[in-house]
Amino acid sequence: MNATDTGMQADPTDLIQRIASLTRMLRDSMRELGLDQAIKDAAEAIPDARDRLRYVAQMTEQAANRVLNATEAAGPIQDGMARGAQALDERWQQWYDQPLELPQARALVQDTRAFLAAVPQHTQQTQAKLMEIVMAQDFQDLTGQVIMRMMDVVGAIERELLQVLLDNVPQERRDEANSLLNGPQVNPGGKADVVTSQDQVDDLLASLGF
């Protein structure tokens, strides 16, 4: 954009001040992100946003591996119980259909009692694996805070950059785009003067000639 071509006299000092303010805001936000007390113990060694994203990816991968390992360990336990129960059920059905000799009946009863005696142990093993799956989800508390804070930072930067653009474009373009400045909102509540999607952000930039 050329101030001479548009008839506007841009104020370089004001633009520089805005950029400086944006830089300070970014640095302050990143500093706050690094020192946030809720995640300090787990993430205080991560110095910048790139490392934070790597941290989120690592935590997610670790949780996925824990879930997969627990599932793979619990599967054979459940399969074994299912096969044992099915085999006993078939043997009992055969006895009902045709009475067994005493030694065979005694063996069936003993096998059934042995199966039932092993059920609590198998149940405890399965419960332990289920608890491991539940505990693997604890990463969401930490990574969720990191992601939400970074989203807030990105949203604030986007709004500030859009405001800088609006303040330095011709008046006719500013009037067209100004109603979209209020920024992306998850729940616009029926308002027509807010940006509700990334497409509208793109439309706003297009209306400004970018």
Curated annotation (Swiss-Prot):
Keyword Cytoplasm: yes
Main location: cytoplasm
GO terms of biological process kind: archaeal or bacterial-type flagellum-dependent cell motility; chemotaxis; regulation of chemotaxis
Transmembrane domains' residue ranges: none
Location within or outside the cell: Cytoplasm
Residues the UniProt record annotates as site (Enhances dephosphorylation of CheY-P): 145
Keyword Aminoacyl-tRNA synthetase annotated: no
Coiled-coil intervals, chain numbering: none
Cellular component annotations (GO), alphabetically ordered: bacterial-type flagellum; cytoplasm
Keyword vocabulary terms for this entry: Chemotaxis, Cytoplasm, Flagellar rotation, Hydrolase, Protein phosphatase
Alphabetized InterPro entries for the sequence: Chemotax_Pase_CheZ (IPR007439), CheZ_family_phosphatases (IPR050992)
Annotated EC: 3.1.3.-
GO molecular function: phosphoprotein phosphatase activity
Family the entry assigns: Belongs to the CheZ family.
Subunit structure, interactors included: Homodimer.
Function: Plays an important role in bacterial chemotaxis signal transduction pathway by accelerating the dephosphorylation of phosphorylated CheY (CheY-P).
Stated name of the protein: Protein phosphatase CheZ
Species: Bordetella pertussis (strain Tohama I / ATCC BAA-589 / NCTC 13251)
Phylogenetic placement of the source organism: Bacteria, Pseudomonadati, Pseudomonadota, Betaproteobacteria, Burkholderiales
Name of the coding gene: cheZ
